Every structure is written in C-alpha cells, then in structure tokens.
Amino acid sequence: MAVYIATVPPVGWEKVWDEAARRADYSGPRPPVITDMSVLIQHGADIGALVTRTVTRELLAAAPHLKLVQVPFAGVDSFDLATLREAGVPLANSHGNHEVTAEHAIALMFALTRRIIPYDRDLRQGIWHGFTTMDEPVIGLYGKTVGIAGLGHIGGHILRICRAMDMKVLGLKRTAGGAYSDLVDRAYGPEEKMEFLRASDFVVDVLPLTSETENFFGKAEFEAMRGHWFINIGRGGTVDEKALYEALKDGTLAGAGIDPWWVYPQQPVAKDPVTGRMLHPVFPAHEPFWELPNVVMSPHTGGFADVSVDGLWGESFENAIRADRGETPKNLVDLQRGY
C-alpha cells in the first residue's frame, strides 16, 4: 500500500514531504498526486492513506485497504462523515497552523480596537486623528475580558496570547475538562452560553461547523453581547449572517472581525494580468458587511502564513505515512461529533 495525494499540494511540497518522511523514518518514493477522481479510483487497490480535501463514496468502495483519510487543515465540514462512518475509514485533520490562526484572531482584535485600517486610510490623504486629543474611542486590550468559544488547539493558543496581555480569559466548551480548561479564569458549559457572552468584552468564535454549532450565534446571542466585540476565526456557518449584520448596523455590537464567510468563489480566482485585480469579484456574504465602518474583513486567510504550510502539510504527510504502515494516526476526528 502507499500514500496518495488527491488535492493540489502547495509549491515546494516535495521538500515538506522529504522532511516528514525523515521524521517518520520512511525512505520510499514520494506519493503520486492525482486530482482526477476517476483516475484515482483506478489506483484504489493500492491506496493505504489518502491526503485530500474531500472523498467520494465511489473512491471509498474502490479502496479496500484505505487506512486513513487525511485532510491538510483543521476543518472537516467538507466531508460526508456519515459515508466515512459507513465505510469504517478514519479521518484525521491537521493542527499545524493553530498558532498563526490564533495570531490572526488577535490581529483582528487590534485592527478593530486601535482603528488601524481607517487611520491608515486617512493618513494616506493627510488626515490626522488623535495626534493632540483623542476625538474617537480607541480601546486597549489590557485588563479586558475575552471569551473564547471553542478551547481546542487554536482557542488554547489564543488563550496564551491573551494571558500575555494581562487579559481575563473565559472559555466556552461543549464538555467539561480538557487541555485548557484549567488555564481559563472560568470555563462555561453550553447551558451557560448567555452568561458567558454577557461577561466577555470580546467573544472569539473558534467553533467547528457541526449540526450542533450551526447558527450558534444569532440575534439573542448578539443582544447578550451588547456593546461588545465579536471575532470569528472558526466557520461562517456557526453565525446567523443576517443577525450579525443587523447587530453591527444598529450598534448592538461595537464591532466585528470576520475571517470565514458564507459565500466563496466557486472557480479559481482569475486576475487581470496587468492590474492584478479580480476579473469577476465575489462578495463574501449575502448581507453588505463591506458597507459597515465597524467591521474588519479578511478573505479566510487566518490559517495561512509562511510557517503554516510546513506545519499543516508536514503534519499531514507524517500522519499518512505512519497510518499507511499500520501505526495509529494522530488527530483523529470524531465522525459522530464532527471534530
């Protein structure tokens, strides 16, 4: 059996593979990259582990020796988990970018509270703000309370960064215990969600998208956060889009930083070769968030940085190599819960 790659890997993936192979004490050939599912099915009998962004029922049926489906990022909402359960094939994700994703959440907080984007935009036109007097509210993070919804790898790293800034840290978890529960000032359960929201100056959404977390944040939740700030670094589907837009528009929320969205380009982004601008712009939501002054937006880039490619793909490759030779994989996803 062998490892196969069924998605387009990043530039320079060969070097990342070689390093992962060295860590796993593997000296065999690099894996084939086959993105055409019909072609990949023809190799089904040889596939021991598959690095991919999705998988079909037909491929699972054609790969009787498949020991692991490995996704090179954290989110698994693009997979049909019921089909994997039926096939008895485990799914693993990668947490190799949790540090940079946490950094992005903090960057959104700073951009909002320090008004970095409007100040930069105005100063480019010679317009000064606050040089002699503070004529607008600029919010410091020191001493504030941050509530982290989802205390996994990313949430845990956000916790550590906020601790370094002397912030009070609250956590919202589905289950008691866990690696980071003892590090927060207080951990809340799902039944205490509203109390958690009211106590948090900043709420950071790091939730995976599951049937239980879909529209987890809606009108009532934003009302409980009145005057506070909302950061989403998890999944767009965990938030009621219209409710968030209305809460920002009418001032219920002080502001929001948004990285994951509800609308994405369905085709590769085509750019003008001269200007570099997108030929066919795709707005990221059904509601016009881009018209609101109290929103900072990023195009779902929170998990990407120079170091995250090695982290995500290196961890994925090593896990696939070890699974292919019969070792127990790391970072297995609970196919019932969805994370």
Predicted regions and their residues:
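N-terminal glycine-/charge-rich "phosphate-binding" loop or analogous flexible N-terminal tail
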Residues: 1-49
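Alpha-helix C-terminal capping/helix-to-coil transition sites in glycosyltransferase folds
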Residues: 45-46, 65, 198-199, 224-226, ...
